[in-house]
């Protein structure tokens, strides 16, 4: 059946390689293990040329059970909103069948992202329901590749923290930054610079 172009359908799915990187039955007990998964997703995304150098994962805390991952899919799926964090939020909420990861019947959820969130992803973090954000590379690391991370201010983080969302910075930063550098070396598209 041919679709009417005036009524497009948006279909978001993981790339084919995902299950070669992610063990959905594994628990990830430490921040370093959780961050290594987000970085591995980002790295594979670059190696397979399926998107930008950004990966994210959402876990139940404190069990470390993996709920969802996300990888930058902006170019692959022609959608400027499909950053790693946004995709992780979408997939996690679909998996738990809730518009918030903060619903009373759900355990606490945490976001691990290979790079500090941009303005869009940081804004979505507030409404996602995660209670903690842990990132690797910094916005300065991303800007060195000419990615425009948008208007993120110290007040942005203060706002999240006032609402009970803890922020942990620069976990495995060197490993995460290496993925950004690999993307540059491969001539990856800078789609928002």
Residue positions per predicted region:
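A structural microfeature
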Residues: 67-68
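Zinc-dependent deaminase
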Residues: 1-45, 124, 128-193
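Short beta-strand scaffold segments in enzyme catalytic cores
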Residues: 54-64
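Short loop/turn motifs at secondary-structure junctions and domain boundaries
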Residues: 47-51
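Conserved redox-active cysteine motifs that mediate thiol-disulfide chemistry
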Residues: 115, 119-122, 127
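A short, polar/charged loop-to-alpha-helix boundary motif
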Residues: 73-87
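Short, solvent-exposed cationic patches
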Residues: 83-101
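Immediate flanking context of iron-sulfur cluster ligation sites
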Residues: 102-116
């Amino acid at each position: 059946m041919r679709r009417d172009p005036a009524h497009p359908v948006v279909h978001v799915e993981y790339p084919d390689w995902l299950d070669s990187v992610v063990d959905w039955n594994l628990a990830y007990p430490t921040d370093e293990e959780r961050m290594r998964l987000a970085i591995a997703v980002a790295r594979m995304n670059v190696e397979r040329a399926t998107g930008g150098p950004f990966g994210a994962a959402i876990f139940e805390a404190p069990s470390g059970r993996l709920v969802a991952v996300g990888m930058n899919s902006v170019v692959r799926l022609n959608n400027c909103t499909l950053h790693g964090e946004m995709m992780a939020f979408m997939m996690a909420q679909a998996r738990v069948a809730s518009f918030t990861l903060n619903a009373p019947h759900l355990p606490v959820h945490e976001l691990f992202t290979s790079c500090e969130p941009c303005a869009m992803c940081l804004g979505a973090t507030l409404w996602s329901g995660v209670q903690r954000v842990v990132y690797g590379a910094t916005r300065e690391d991303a800007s060195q590749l000419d990615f425009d991370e948008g208007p993120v201010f110290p007040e942005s983080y203060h706002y999240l923290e006032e609402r009970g969302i803890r922020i942990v910075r620069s976990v495995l930063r060197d490993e995460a930054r290496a993925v950004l550098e690999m993307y540059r070396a491969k001539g990856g598209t800078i789609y928002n610079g």
